[in-house]
């Protein structure tokens, strides 16, 4: 019986060596790098998780905020009086896909994420200080870009987040707050 076990282990070891022989590996790292960046949804998810800091429970508006390009870039504030729709007061026109929701869940690494369809109702129902975030579509150019994340308190507070592909995942850093 032990010979059979030894034979199975030997086959598994040889199969493992053969499967990694052609992988693109760095001499100092064991994980292969991915030549092309991850999906835009992963970039947006990284920005949301970054903006949430370490809050254990976060509400995320279920869909992208539709805002003018200048607002998404952080060049001007959301002008509610001037006719911009308040992404913290009305539902998005299109909900996230299941793969976008999965990317967001993965980026939050086990923290509780509640997807909210009606942000105005959610703000009324959630306890004071609860975090509710909404994001615009990422503005990406290759391996870098930005995502405007809005924290609803109840009015939108803009935070422009820079995202960069590091060969394995999108990494997020604050670029600063958008104009208010």
Regions found by a protein language model. Give the residues of each.
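Flexible low-complexity loop/turn motifs enriched in small/helix-breaking residues
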Residues: 17-157, 177-180
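Short beta-strand edge/turn micro-motifs at domain boundaries
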Residues: 158-180
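Sec-dependent bacterial lipoprotein signal peptides
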Residues: 1-15
């Amino acid at each position: 019986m032990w010979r059979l076990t030894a034979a199975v282990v030997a086959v598994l070891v040889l199969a493992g060596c053969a499967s990694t022989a052609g992988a693109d590996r760095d001499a100092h790292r064991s994980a292969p790098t991915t030549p092309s960046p991850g999906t835009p949804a992963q970039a947006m998810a990284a920005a949301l998780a970054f903006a949430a800091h370490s809050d254990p429970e976060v509400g995320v508006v279920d869909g992208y905020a539709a805002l003018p390009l200048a607002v998404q870039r952080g060049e001007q504030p959301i002008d509610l009086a001037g006719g911009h729709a308040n992404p913290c007061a009305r539902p998005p026109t299109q909900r996230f896909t299941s793969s976008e929701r999965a990317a967001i869940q993965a980026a939050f690494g086990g923290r509780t994420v509640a997807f909210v369809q009606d942000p105005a109702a959610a703000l009324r129902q959630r306890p004071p200080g609860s975090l509710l975030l909404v994001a615009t579509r990422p503005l990406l150019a290759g391996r870098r870009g930005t995502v405007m994340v809005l924290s609803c308190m109840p009015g939108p507070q803009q935070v422009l987040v820079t995202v960069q592909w590091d060969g394995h995942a999108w990494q997020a850093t604050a670029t600063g707050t958008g104009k208010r």
